[in-house]
Each structure stands twice: as structure tokens, then as C-alpha cells.
Amino acid sequence: MTHAFFSDPAEKILTELTPTERAAVESVRRSLEDDPAQGRGLPDADPRSESRVVELLPEQTGGRGISVVYRYSQDLDACLILWLIAGP
């Protein structure tokens, strides 16, 4: 099983989300542990990892749309959630 965890900036943003938005983001974090390649690929300069994003619609969060940006390393079998970008 892949480990998925939040970076310090993502943890800070997480505290600013509503309870339903936090629950939706936590659901993504848990699902990354089972399927780390589920997000859409992003341009990445590091050949040893992949940058990806999972986009949550307002209907899924009960609030704003949220993009969960993360990096997956196959060598470490881990996902680091770098940013949580919340829309209007």
C-alpha cells in the first residue's frame, strides 16, 4: 500500500477548509493509498516521480472546487500532497 501524506503548506490550507471540503480532500488522500496514479498528469522535470492532480467539483466537496496537487514516487511508494487549491 502506498503512503499518502500532506506537505506543511497543504496541512495549513487544510485547516482553512470547511468540514465537508476537508472530508472530500481526506477521501482523496485515502484513495491515493490504493491508486496513486489516479490523477491527471502534470508536466514534471523529475524522472523519478510524477506530478499529478485530482480535481474535486463543488458537488463533491459541498463547497468550492478543490484541486489536490501531489507528487508520486514509485521508488518510495509514497504520495506527497503538495498543494490544495480551492476555487471561488
What are these regions (language model features)?
Residues 22-24, 35, 50, 71-72, ...:
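Generic alpha-helical propensity signal that fires on short helical segments
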Residues 1, 12-16, 56-88:
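Enriched for short, Lys/Arg-rich terminal
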Residues 30-62:
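A short, surface-exposed loop/turn module that caps and links secondary-structure elements
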